[in-house]
Amino acid sequence: MKNKITILGCGSSLGSPWITGHKGNDSNNIKNIRTRCSAHIRYKNLSILIDTSPDIKMQFRMNKITDLDAVVYTHDHADQTAGIFELRPFFWKNKKKIPVYGSKETIKLLMKNNTYCFRNIKGYQAILESKIIKNTFSIKKKE
């Protein structure tokens, strides 16, 4: 498989156009319709997601991405993390937790705000495995 980086979204934290039809942003111009920030990296046999924007389901479907090995979070803002629950189908498909990488602070906040994704809680099976980035790191396919 070819190595590839796909920008899935490059809009602001509100996306573009805004839900209110923000003035000065002509939504008839295709260049003004942008989903929130995230990216996908296809490297050798790995499928790596950078951030889980609120638009992640649509972004994956539009780009025909059907597999996922890991997620890297740049920081813990809603526009980077709100799509975290959309990772469940990849856990169900692969029957293994998805490793998520981020700084100590980002992982701490993700675990606090999305406890059900990291710990078994009544009605929810943990789907994610936290990986704190200290300096350099590498991602390997889980077998």
Report residues per predicted region.
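Binuclear metal-dependent hydrolase catalytic cores
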Residues: 1-143
